[in-house]
């Protein structure tokens, strides 16, 4: 049972969510990235809502959701999604995940494949190589000492093109505010999952068979085109799309460059 609060609803486990779009249509779930929240999808919803029921929610400890009551893992995040689908009596959904969200939906596909109709994995990591892996782990470890905001400005430089940063100061401040709102311990735990969780997803013993599309930005230095090629190669019949010019959070710069390939893919599946 869910309780209604102004602007969103709260599930039994404390997950904040919105269920919008076309009631009774196939469900599309949108999972945000580390230090963000469900509102990152606000410019994608209009295009999706005409044909789909949309479920956006905050990861545990993020946005308006409660902090997790146990150690944060990809499996815990997958269980959060499972519980929400059960709570809403949604038997099957297409799940779109950005960055760590694309790790969560892969974990969900490995653990609960019968609950998925499709996957869209956006700007999500694969094997990083030793040097890049060490850098990501160092960054994640520093958060425990210095706090989440210590790496914020460097993150914005990695995430957005210089011209977009300069001409959209309001959006930059909104992204900062999303991170400020994350429970500090939850952020540190999630950062470590993002840094180290890839190893449990690569080369799985039983490959993901859910129809999938893998998308990243040409200039994403953390979830590179080569990583997306590798992710797609490990999923049977996965499609691949590389969006030119953009960086890690390109889906906030050019929403339709990401939403339209997802919509086209879902239509091919008659969803």
Could you tell me what each predicted segment is?
Residues 218-223:
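Acidic catalytic loop of the alpha/beta-hydrolase fold
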Residues 1-28, 50-53, 90-91, 199, ...:
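Alpha/beta-hydrolase fold catalytic core
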Residues 130-134, 146-206:
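Conserved alpha/beta-hydrolase catalytic His-Asp/Glu region
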Residues 106-111, 115-152:
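Flexible "cap/lid" loop of the alpha/beta hydrolase fold
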Residues 238-271:
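Catalytic active-site module of serine/aspartate enzymes centered on a nucleophile-bearing elbow/loop
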Residues 208, 214-216:
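Short beta-strand/loop motif that positions the catalytic acidic residue
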Residues 13-67:
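Conserved HGGG/HGGXW glycine-rich cap/lid loop of the alpha/beta-hydrolase fold
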Residues 75-93:
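Conserved acidic catalytic loop of the alpha/beta-hydrolase fold
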């Amino acid at each position: 049972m869910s309780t209604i609060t102004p602007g969103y609803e709260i599930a039994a486990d404390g997950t904040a969510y919105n269920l919008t779009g076309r009631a009774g249509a196939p469900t599309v779930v949108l999972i945000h990235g580390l230090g963000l929240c469900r509102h990152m999808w606000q410019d994608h919803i209009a295009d999706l809502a005409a044909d789909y029921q949309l479920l956006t929610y905050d990861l545990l400890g993020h946005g308006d959701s409660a902090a997790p009551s146990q150690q944060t893992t990809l499996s815990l995040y997958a269980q959060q999604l499972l519980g929400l689908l059960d709570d809403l009596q949604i038997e099957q959904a297409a799940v779109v995940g950005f960055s760590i969200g694309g790790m969560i939906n892969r974990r969900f596909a490995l653990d609960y494949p019968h609950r998925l109709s499709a996957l869209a994995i956006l700007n999500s990591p694969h094997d990083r190589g030793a040097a890049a892996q060490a850098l990501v782990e160092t960054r994640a470890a520093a958060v425990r000492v210095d706090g989440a905001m210590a790496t914020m400005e460097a993150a914005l430089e990695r995430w957005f093109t210089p011209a977009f940063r300069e001409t959209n100061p309001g959006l930059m401040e909104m992204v900062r505010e999303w991170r400020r709102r994350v429970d500090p311990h939850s952020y540190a735990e999630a950062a470590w999952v993002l840094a180290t969780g890839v190893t449990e997803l690569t080369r799985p013993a039983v490959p993901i068979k859910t129809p999938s599309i893998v998308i990243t930005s040409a200039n994403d230095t953390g979830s590179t085109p080569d990583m997306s090629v590798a992710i797609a190669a490990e999923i049977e019949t996965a499609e691949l799309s590389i969006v030119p010019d953009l960086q890690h959070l390109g889906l906030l710069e050019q929403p339709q460059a990401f939403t339209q390939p997802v919509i086209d893919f879902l239509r091919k599946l008659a969803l």
